[in-house]
């Protein structure tokens, strides 16, 4: 099980991730992807549904787009500017989140606290499909979840998992991505004791040891905000942020 703790240490890279054809994640939607009618994004008890009545509903998160019966065969997409858009089957626009930023790669995520959050653009990417210094072979490790948010920590063999890919903060102080063709690692084996990985509120991944000495950093730095590291189903580990749109509790919505 991934060990996630909330830390109070604040502290990103301007890198845009090239578009690749990837499968829709279970709890995230990337720029250019579509959530079809009756499609779901889930995180624990929270379920985002693009309903057949054209209403986008976050069950147990007390939010909806209020577009019931405004169209048929509706679909939700996330643009390259971080805007969520619901379109009717005829292509007309039914609803927009209204939040836009610079062109890039964004992610809409069902947050574990019950919010729908759009973060981006991407600021850092771990690539296990390219041969290089950080390559290593795949080995079998048990699975857990795929998201690390700002302020959260992985330590003591804590891991993120997605399909056949696993990002592990190993007890030997090495951060390792198992999967892809070549895998990836931070090359910090044996460089510290009781090391942990933290994503800060400026989008930077940092490995620190028990004395809080920095062992490794993604060297990505952007403005203060909320970020997320997603271990995607295609094997890429990508940091998106800051948040440019998020839902808040409105009224309770009963499941139909």
Curated annotation (Swiss-Prot):
Chief place where the protein resides: secreted
Residues making up the signal peptide according to the UniProt record: 1-23
GO molecular function: D-mannose binding
Subcellular location per the Swiss-Prot or TrEMBL entry: Secreted
Disulphide linkage map: 54-74, 173-195
Keyword match Cell membrane: no
Keyword Repeat: yes
Keywords: Disulfide bond, Hemagglutinin, Lectin, Mannose-binding, Repeat, Secreted, Signal
Motif Carbohydrate-binding motif 1 boundaries: 51-59
Positions occupied by motif Carbohydrate-binding motif 2: 170-178
Record's function text: Mannose-specific lectin. Shows agglutinating activity towards erythrocytes from rabbit.
Name of the featured protein: Mannose-specific lectin 1
Taxonomic source organism: Remusatia vivipara
């Amino acid at each position: 099980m991934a060990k996630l703790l909330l830390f109070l240490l604040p502290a990103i890279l301007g890198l845009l991730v090239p578009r690749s054809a990837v499968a829709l994640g279970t709890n995230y939607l990337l720029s250019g992807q579509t959530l079809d009618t009756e499609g779901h994004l889930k995180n624990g008890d929270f379920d985002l549904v693009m309903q057949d009545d054209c209403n986008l509903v976050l069950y147990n998160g007390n939010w909806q787009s209020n577009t019931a019966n405004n169209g048929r065969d509706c679909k939700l997409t996330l643009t390259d500017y971080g805007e969520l858009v619901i379109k009717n089957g005829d292509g007309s626009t039914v609803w927009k989140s209204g939040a836009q930023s610079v062109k890039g790669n964004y992610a809409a995520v069902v947050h574990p606290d019950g919010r729908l959050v759009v973060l981006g653009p991407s600021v850092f990417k771990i690539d296990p499909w390219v041969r290089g210094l950080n390559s290593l072979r795949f080995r079998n490790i048990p699975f857990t979840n795929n998201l690390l948010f700002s302020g959260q920590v992985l330590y003591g063999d804590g891991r993120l998992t997605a399909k056949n890919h696993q990002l592990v903060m190993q007890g030997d102080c090495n951060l390792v991505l198992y999967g892809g063709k070549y895998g990836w690692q931070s090359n910090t084996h044996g460089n510290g004791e009781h090391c942990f990985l933290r994503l800060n509120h400026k989008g930077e991944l940092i490995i620190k040891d028990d004395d809080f000495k920095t062992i490794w950093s993604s060297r990505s730095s952007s403005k203060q905000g909320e970020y997320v590291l997603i271990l995607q189903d295609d094997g890429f580990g990508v940091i998106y942020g800051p948040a440019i749109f998020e839902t808040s509790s409105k009224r309770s919505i009963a499941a139909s």
